[in-house]
Amino acid sequence: MGINSIFPRQLEADDIVAYICREHEGTKVIVSVDQDFLQLVSSECTLYDPIRKKFFEDGNFQEQTGYQNVDEWYTAKCLIGDSSDNVPGVRGFGKKTVQKYLKDPGYILSEKEHKIFQRNADIFCLDKYEELPEEKKYYKEQLEVKVDACYKTFLKYCEEYHFKRILDKKEDWHNLFFMKSLYNKLNDITS
């Protein structure tokens, strides 16, 4: 159908997304509400949150998150923790305390605070693929498979399996297939 597919073996999907974003050149747009993907935002990678209809990019990162850059955001996440993932943060660190910490290069975490920070960094970091060279090689090979985008085959498949919602929006799928300004189309949604 013209779409590369990667079948996870040992890694979770978010680690595979991280691999694609960090290891492959070119523009990438992640469409997800998962804020953990903010750590992947770069000059080549944008996160689009379809619920909030917001883009998180290199150029607007501070405006959208309140943090100057990805490193600051990641440091804050490791200190604050994430209640939605059931990961407690360093005691006494909320958004205000984190901002003070980030502005004070002389602040040193206690040994206990540092252990919690490091544990959270290990949990939140999307680079598990680095620990598994065979997996990394496998995903690289999966992405190198050349698939021809065939819109007609895609539509035939959708008709055969009665994918009515896709068929109702053929033009949108056509634009996706041929990458006709996906970024601009998503940007129009947010305006």
Predicted regions and their residues:
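Extended two-metal-dependent nuclease catalytic cores across DNA- and RNA-processing enzymes
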Residues: M1-D168, F177, L182-I189
